[in-house]
Amino acid sequence: MTDRSRRVHDDSIIIDGAFTNFSVPIPPTESVPDMMLDHIIDGGVTAVCHSLIADPFPMSAEEALMTLYDESIVFDAFPDKTVQILTAQDIEDAKAAGKLGIIFATQGMASIGTNMRYIWVYHKLGVRVMQLTYNERSALGCGCKEPVDTGLTRFGEQAVEQMNALGIVLDLSHCGVRTSLEAIAHSQAPAIFSHASVRALNG
C-alpha cells in the first residue's frame, strides 16, 4: 500500500455492511471474539452492521428479542474496544476513539410477523438497519429469488413509514427489483443495499 493510499484508508470511515460472524459467549471470555475485534480494528474498520436476526435462520419475535439482549453483552465485555452505534455521530466518535462501532441490523423482517410494534421494540433495543425481505416473499414484499415480484405490500409500506419515523435505515439487499424500487419511492429517507452486486457486471 502506498503512503497516499494508507492516508486515505486511515482517514476514511469504513463500514462493513453485512457482518455476521461475531458472537460473545455467555459468560464472556477473552478468547476468539477478542482476537477478532483486534483484527477488525487493526484493519481500519470503523463500524460493522452486525446482522443479529436473519430470515434464513427463522426465529420468533421472542427469540429475536433474546438475541438482541444477548448480543448486547459485547459492549460490557469489551468496553475498551466496542461502542454501540445509535446515531451517525456515534460512528464519527467511534472513529475518533479508535473503537469498533457495532450497528445492530436484521436481514429480513419475518420475525416481526404482522405486528408493527416489534419494529419500535427492536429500535429501542438498538437496531438501526432493517432489511425488508430475504430472497423470498413475505408479508412486506418479494425477495430477489421470487420468479414474480409483486412489489411492496401495504404492510410493507407501513413498515417503511415506521422505519422512517424511527430513523431505522431501510436495507434492500436480497429484495426483488420491483419491491426495491417501490420501497425507495415510498421511503422519505435514503435506502441502502448493504451487500449486493452490480447486475451489469454480475448478470
Whereabouts are the PLM-identified features?
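N-terminal hydrophobic targeting/anchoring segments and the immediately downstream early-domain regions
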Residues: M1-D149, R154, R199-G203
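Active-site core of metal-dependent hydrolases
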Residues: L132, E136-G203
